[in-house]
Amino acid sequence: MRTKSRFSEAEREAVYRAIFERRDVRRNFLRRPIPDAVMRRLLTAAHHAGSVGFMQPWDFVVIRNHGTKRTVKDLFIDANTKASARYAGAKGALYRGLKLEGIEEAPINLCVTCSRRRGGSSVLGRSTVRATDLYSTCCAVQNLWLAARAEGIGVGWVSILDHEKLKRVIGVPKSVTVLAYLCLGYVSKFEAQPDLETAGWRSRIPVGRLIHEESWGNRIQDKRGDGDAHHQGLHKNRGRGKNQTGRRTTSVERQSAGRSLRHDR
C-alpha cells in the first residue's frame, strides 16, 4: 500500500486534537451500540501499533454479555474496597467519591492481553529488556484510545481489578498476561479536562519540569520560563497568530498553547 509522506494541515490538526482531547471515561456512556465495522476499525488501529521484534503480542477479548460485566463489576468492587483503605481523612473521602469504572454502563468491555511467548524464546530486541512486549501492548492500547476519540467513542481503563481472578472469568490462559481492561461506548460528551483534575485529585505537571537536556536534572524550564518546550515560539508571538518561524499558527497549536499556559499557572 502506497503511503503519503506528508500530512495535510487538517490531518495533522486532527492527530493532535485526538491526543489533547483523549479522556479516561467512566461516565456519560450512551446505550447506542458500537457497530461491528467501527469496532473492527478500532481493533485494526490497535493492531497496527509498533511492537518489539514485530512480535504483535496482543489479543483482544470483546465482552458484550451483561452477566460477564456484572461478574467483572463484582471483582472491581472487591478490589476497590481494599484500595480505598489506603486513603484516610479528606483524601479517603475524595477517593470514595470518585467514579472509577463504567463496566456495566459501557456497551462494550475489552480485555487487552499480552502473549509473552509469542514469537518463541528469542524475540528480536527483547533479550535485554524483557518487558518490551508489555510496553508494545501498551502502544496498542493507546492506538485504540486515540482512534476511539476520533470516532466519538469514550474509553475508560479499569485498573482496579485482580487480573488472576479476571482471567478465570473470561478464560484467559495462565501463560497470557492481562494488560488492560477497557470500557468502550459512545458518550454524551467528552469532558474539557481529566476527571481526576476536575475532582482535585491531581493536576497536570508542566511538561518543562519533565524534559532534561543531555543529562538528568538539566531541565529546560530552568532556561525557558513557562516550561512548555513544544510551544515556546507560540508564546513569543502569542496573539499575533504566528510562531517563532513566522509561519501562521494552526488552530491546534493555538489550542495547545492555551492549554500549556493554563497548566503552568
Regions found by a protein language model. Name each.
Residues 55-137:
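Glycine/small-residue-rich phosphate/adenosyl-binding loop
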Residues 48-53:
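Glycine-rich phosphate/pyrophosphate-binding beta-alpha loops
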Residues 80-88, 172-195:
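A glycine-rich helix N-cap at a beta->alpha junction
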Residues 25-41:
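A short N-terminal beta-strand-loop micro-motif at the entrance of redox/enzyme domains
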Residues 42-47, 110, 119-169:
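Small-aliphatic-rich amphipathic alpha-helix that forms the alpha element of a beta-alpha
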Residues 2-11, 18, 25, 181-225:
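C-terminal helix-cap and adjacent tail motif
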Residues 227-265:
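Phosphate/pyrophosphate-binding loop motifs in nucleotide- or prenyl diphosphate-using proteins
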Residues 43, 66, 261-265:
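Generic structural concept
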